[in-house]
Amino acid sequence: MMSLNPLLLVGGVIGTVSVLLLIAYACVKDKKTAMGFERSMADGEILRRLFGYAKPYLRQFVVVGFLVLFSISYDIASPLIVGYIEELVVGDFELKSLYVSVAVYAGVLVFSMASTYLQAVILQRVGQRIISDLREDLFTHIESLSHGQLNDIPVGKLVTRVTNDTNAISMMFTNLFVNLTKNAFVILGILVAMLFLNYELTLMVLCFVPFILLFTVIFRKFSRRAYRKVKDATTEINTYLSENLSGIKVTQIFGREDEKMEEFRQKSQTLAKATQEQIFVFGVFRPLVYMLYISSILCLFYLGGMGHLNHVTFLGQTISSGTIVTFYMYISKFFTPIQNLAEQFNWLQSALASSEKVFSIMDIQPQMVDAPDAVELDEVKGDIEFRDVWFSYIPGEWVLQGVSFHVEPRQTVAFVGSTGSGKSTILSLICRNYEFQKGEILIDGIDIRKIKISSLRRHFGQMLQDVFLFSGTIRSNIVLREENIPDEEIMKVCRYVNADHFINKLEHGLDEEVRERGNNFSAGQRQLLSFARTILHKPSVMILDEATANIDTETELLIQDSLEKMRSVGTMLIVAHRLSTIQHADNIIVLSRGKILEQGTHQQLLAAHGRYYQLYTLQYHKEQMDKQ
């Protein structure tokens, strides 16, 4: 060790270059398909948008930055202090000097721990606020999408975006950014400190870095693939659960529990296998780095011990026992952030991929947007007119073809026809759930495309066959928009639509619990609650889509009575399953394959012996046969 070993010098140079390459390589963006889907957004663009959410909390991040500097100072200074204490102990020293050194070390340690704690608390609070803001924006954007756009996105995928992907982004703010920066500066700071302390021992440590670089390249390749599999399998199982738990009653009715269980088992095993692969990759990488760490320690003890025993100097630097202790601590602090750096940059790329998936949802432009000159409607008389309206869900496959009709204020108009004739589509277009391709739809003489969507829908009350009730109480499901409505007014509406018949029998009345989707109530009871919800908000136009289908006779009588009362509220549009429920309608429009075949009153259509007559006769004979 009297002269510098050339091989040691070469190894040190290669090691230094490897450190820089390690940091640079970890920063390289993944390929477009690296995270399992076609990436089109640059990392810089993703970070810019994410930092837009972090901007309101810039002051807190500045504070965290100073706390990180304090932590880095401890990582660099503590080995020097311990090394100094070691030299005091082995030499002639006074207890006062030892006490001072120990006190300084303890003070630095306590200060560092306090800084780390405050840093974690601030980051967690800020990170959760940022993710809360992002989730709210994402949820609000999903609410703005049209029915057609929502039909194209599986619910399970949306749930994954709002939960799993935002959690990955949360890790970026609460952990990754700060620790990545900290680890990079710790590595460089320790490298400078070791060079300042002893060149030769530093070059020895750097000889091991090329191996770490090699392991990192291999690790990143396999860990990225493993993470992609876990992420894809998680999305797949979330989508499967969302669909099958919602339809579990159908599964039970048809006795398909075993088949569905087998499908779920396969997806669960796929996720388990992917997770095991991810664990294996991390389980191999860490021991390899640890092996290099142990090897460097052994070399330190050998070279350092030989240099210390032989009292060797190199470029004026001597190797004392304090130097060996200091290097021992530095090597530990040097290898740990290198190992973490490789893993954290991999998680960063995964978080960026999750961010892109979230932003890909937020970048979907809503099909239904207000025109720049859209107007608010203070009131609606209920005059509705279709003028040569054409509409298709799929380009070229027309669902409505040149439909024209006029509904006068306070009229009751019914739409009948076979499945797929366009009845429900007409009602959806009136509420602007979809955008029609040709023609005009007028409300009180105003094109609905020139009316603000929120204003338009505020004047409509929709009662569908498949009534959706939210988890909560009967009261919360009836009032929906306005929580300050008194119980007296709610019960008045319930009596009006005959919903009080079953509400009064419940133990908690309006405070009775409503479980998910209202599954603890019958179809008829859910329908009556839907009527109450609609009437309470005083709509000018009421829309009933198969509202009396699939209910028992007793409840149907209550609903029929409710419908008769509601006819006086305003304009009523009905899609009827049972023709007996629309005999008193002011106008009945008969549809077939998206075209109007005939229209008129019940008696006029029967006298015409057209399509309505055929439908009514078939249904009448069926009802007679059912009675027999």
What role is predicted for each listed range?
Residues M1-S40, F61-S115, I122, F196-E200, ...:
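Transmembrane helix-loop-helix hairpins at lipid-water interfaces of multipass membrane proteins
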Residues M2-S3, F66, Y74-S78, Y84, ...:
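Hydrophobic alpha-helical transmembrane segments of ABC transporter permease domains
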Residues A26-D43, F66-L67, Y74-E87, V108-V155, ...:
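Juxtamembrane helix-loop junctions of ABC transporter transmembrane domains
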Residues D43-P56, L158:
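A short amphipathic helical element positioned immediately N-terminal to and/or at the very start
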Residues K55, F93, Q128, E136-T160, ...:
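Short intracellular "coupling" helices and adjacent cytoplasmic loop segments at the cytosolic face
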Residues K55-R59, H147-G148, N164-F173, F177, ...:
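An intracellular "coupling" helix at the cytosolic face of ABC transporter transmembrane type-1 domains
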Residues D92-E94, V100, A193-C207, E277-E356, ...:
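Helix-loop-helix
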Residues D363, D370-A371, L377-Q628:
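ABC-type nucleotide-binding domain
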